[in-house]
């Protein structure tokens, strides 16, 4: 159970790609069940065990790994984890039962736990229903939204702007005049902020203007350019007012006026003057739509009802608000209000420093403001704070501004400025600065240094920051000096866990040490959001509109003066456990009166909202739900027969809410269902939008007379749809965590254990077929050797002659002499050789003589049974495709060998004629020699030199040479020539596997010998031919492998290059798929194995099946695509196809065998018989996953082999052959487009906004859309109601397609650039290229974040915050391309849009993959030119880091990470337990709702346990001796990111 469940991951299954997504499997194949231990390989015989064996040359002396206890270790680990899981389950069950509800009705029983836990109620909405209703209202009439701070007014403004822009673009397309939208703000800071928000959420040019930009100097032509270039202008109100008055901008050129903080519209405020002087002066038909936003209709004291009515009249709008405070309370958390009362303050007084400064410099006018603040600060803040004001006012960076101000003051008061007076005051200012610098400031900790008010603030903040609970605080002050001085004070006080910062308004030209820039203000907000600052001392700039992140403590250090100040500052405390503290002076009647007055004003405001006419109150869509529930008669119901569970209109809402919550990622807010109610004819229609991670997006319900009924009906139908897709079980509980992972896990639902034996082809069928073919013509392959450096002897080329023409083989390496790498070059000769009977007899004799003399095998002379012939060849000047075999055959040598069985030894033979000969022992296959020279100083009776290899008979050279038995030796010695020359010779090594370098044992073998020729036989074959033929076993073995691989390709009707075909079928160890694990039973000399091709083929398989499903099923949703694709590409499906087509027969799982390279079918007369070996080696044990991997490798080989028309043709055909499914019946790339029927939305005439979008994207990215609505679909978020998207589907289908296209282009790039990297390295670095983290940054770089069409308040905020962070990271990176690595994870919609865009351009271009490659080269590859900077990207994942730490730092291999599901009682949320086990010790465990997060948590805990542990301490603590047994084969089972 645990091994399968350990791969289940709800969250990543829900995501549109397996996150693949940030979140990726680094060691993906190490989790798939247990790899069984290999059977011990048959021991090789000792090469010297029997000196008289007639065939010792056939004993293979190459080392074989010893068997290991790997399988036993896995079984122990599994048992340990099962025991732990059982123990934890037993411990949990009683607690779970205690928590289970016991008094619930039948139809609620299955949902009770989550309803209670999540407090779902009727299911809160996101976006909220009142926001949707307000947006719909604002589209049709001028509206002022009176909603509490934090209730999402800006979201409504963004939606309204988008709606207005879409209509504007359509109008422009129809030839109407251009109009723009104005977003008016009351401060420069808000102009920056709101413009940034709009740019991040609107795909049009957004400009922001303020007075400091010199707008008052712009003429009409400049404004015309801005109106032409921009769709939205954010500006301070006075700018627009002046433009309207000057007629630079006319009211009929504006389509929407948005008033931010609309309560300012009164008296002579620019808001009021714009409406009064320009808006009302225009004809009603020429007036723009008006939308105002405020938390309160007034910002001063007075009659609220009268003020609200006046605001409505002034803005020509109607207030819309909510009648019930509880409606907003569920959205905007109301803080707990507290009053912090401090003791009475002293009257202001002069401190010592104040007196000193007043005495010396009291008449310097530029310091008047500092004197005033320091005087009042002595009472309000205390002596220390009063004195520190001088430090800030006279700091070095402030002095130049003070000096400049002195000059201005003197010039303004004196007609003829006296330079002497100016100079004198400047000197005095500098002296004052030195005085302050030299002054000894007291310690603020001393009694009397701080006022009672500051002391109380210190005490309370110390309490709130007493631990690291994550307190975030804003302290509001009236004056900027106060904020800055308090910030300095609390920095000095150094309260634990408190990190102070300051946020004050920007005042250009300000002096006195208070000047700040917009950048400083922005950075303060960023630091506060990230937690670098957790206590912000701020002025009113943080009250109104500024994007301040939620905090849980707000302190009004200086008491508010108006209701709007109170409401807005309170609104900053939005956390569910927030505190809003008001500091008041004890016994201060004014303070008490102000508190009472403001609270009374809020009550009046609430009553005003409740007394508004019915049509101006936002009830949400549930306002009449209670009464409607009484009208059940005639409503549909659905009952599950097996359980009796009943679905009703009423229960459907709660069921969907709970279903949505089951899709939650950890540490995320609970996903929620969106209901959009629209008006159609005389009825209401509701669209249900499920969360983005849901495989079912939702539906549009049936029309109903009332809103609530329409909503319930749509929810009811959605529940039925979820039931249909088996996403709700028989109790209407979400079974998402069971359903999706089961399908997602299909790819790994097979075992890699070596449990099955399969037939293996040892010889290509061409040799057997040729034996029955008449011999009238032979075809030749010219084989030559090209060494990397000179060899010790000459190697002449040879011809391999066959009955049938063989394909052209690629060059491959063998290792001759002392591991000199030598290329084997083979060229097929174009023409056949008409052969005579005599020539055939000669060739047969020559070939059989090679087997006898060189390889100690004597075969019967049977011409018809010969599978091939060998002949000496002449050297080729170039490729031999146009040559005739007859012209290139050395017939003289063939005839000489045919006519001479050997060169006889005679006593009168010239000794020099024996040099450079091949001499062999006729009785012992171990002894073959190349003669080097005549040893004139030695006689046959002399003892052999001590350097020669040891043998039994070492008394003299003649005895040493002879290998006969005792009696035969005596007869030979009695008649031999004891005066013959002694020859220096080189003993030929028994090494046959020249496909790999020599082993240490082979290198240590001594080859120099001294021999006599008479006991041996002198071969008639020239030594240059013998040298080449000694390599023939390795050569013919590799050619056989090529032919077997090509035979498999022929069976599958695939045309693949031989080198790629063989690579795809090569498995060179028991655990080839474990890319970095120690290879078990590694087979030497097999060349490249399938792992890189499998990596490439897996990616193409994903892309090909994605395209096929997309083209044939245009109406499927993304969930269907994922499940159907997984069924196609899963290992189980590939394995089943491979079994059906017997692909296992062609897999090469064994290296060179010295037993099976000999020609098959000949009658062996002398030598060791290998027929039994052929039978035993004709089987091999393969894991199911290996067979599936080979299928993927074949696809990769097909891809590299190209195709007749398109380079993807052969790979496409391979996918069809290997998935064997009706869903993919494509024989070439161009057939995909023939399967595709364009959906209606794609071919419809695009709206003006869609044409505009396509034009902008073409300008920026260079691709021209033939069908702009495809692009519109690529930017449409699932949260957007379909009725608002103009029937363009959301991007999920295109994202599904684009995800696979992106994978493919990235993998191909890495595959080409890094030919020697293993698949794990490629996977880890591909992770960086396709990670959500990178794609999110790329999305921002390309501006996609501004184009997204979404309807989600949290999403808008997430995008804005992410854009701020990623742009800040880029700015600080100094040009580094990996700036995105340090940023937080982006909202998922941003990377999704990049992938959807790729899908869109691919479909638009009629499936031209080149458009994907162009995008990759321009936009992606520049980030990844240097891949080394991403070497640690994947390794930062806790699971991978743990693996590397245990393996590399501690050298441990006996560990694992297991995960398994904890059984639960019905209705309780499923849980997963993960544990890290090291040498039988459970060192960490963790629980979570998904396997993914459980593993991450367990890995993090394990890393904490191991932190600081030295290697020797680790070995002692966990009894680890793995380093001492590193040579024993092992593979570690460690977790993946999923």
Swiss-Prot record:
Helicase C-terminal domain boundaries: 460-619
Domain RNase III: 1044-1203, 1254-1406
EC number: 3.1.26.-, 3.6.4.-
Enzyme class per UniProt: hydrolase
UniProt motif DEAH box: location: 260-263
Domain Dicer dsRNA-binding fold span(s) in chain numbering: 652-742
Pfam families named among the record's database cross-references: Dicer_dimer (PF03368), DSRM_2 (PF24995), Helicase_C (PF00271), ResIII (PF04851), Ribonuclease_3 (PF00636)
GO cellular component, one term: cytoplasm
Superkingdom, natural source: Eukaryota
UniProt feature, compositional bias: Basic and acidic residues: 45-55
Domain DRBM as annotated: residue spans: 1440-1508
InterPro entries associated with the record: Dicer_dimer_sf, Dicer_dimerisation_dom, DSRM_2, Helicase/UvrB_N, Helicase_ATP-bd, Helicase_C-like, P-loop_NTPase, PAZ_dom
Positions bound to Mg(2+): 1295, 1392, 1395
SUPFAM superfamilies in alphabetical order: P-loop containing nucleoside triphosphate hydrolases (SSF52540), RNase III domain-like (SSF69065)
Cofactors: Mg(2+); Mn(2+)
Residues annotated as binding ATP: 147-154
GO molecular function: ATP binding; DNA binding; helicase activity; metal ion binding; ribonuclease III activity; RNA binding
Job description of the protein: Dicer-like endonuclease involved in cleaving double-stranded RNA in the RNA interference (RNAi) pathway. Produces 21 to 25 bp dsRNAs (siRNAs) which target the selective destruction of homologous RNAs leading to sequence-specific suppression of gene expression, called post-transcriptional gene silencing (PTGS). Part of a broad host defense response against viral infection and transposons.
Family indicated by similarity: Belongs to the helicase family. Dicer subfamily.
Annotated protein name in UniProt: Dicer-like protein 1
Gene name as annotated: dcl1
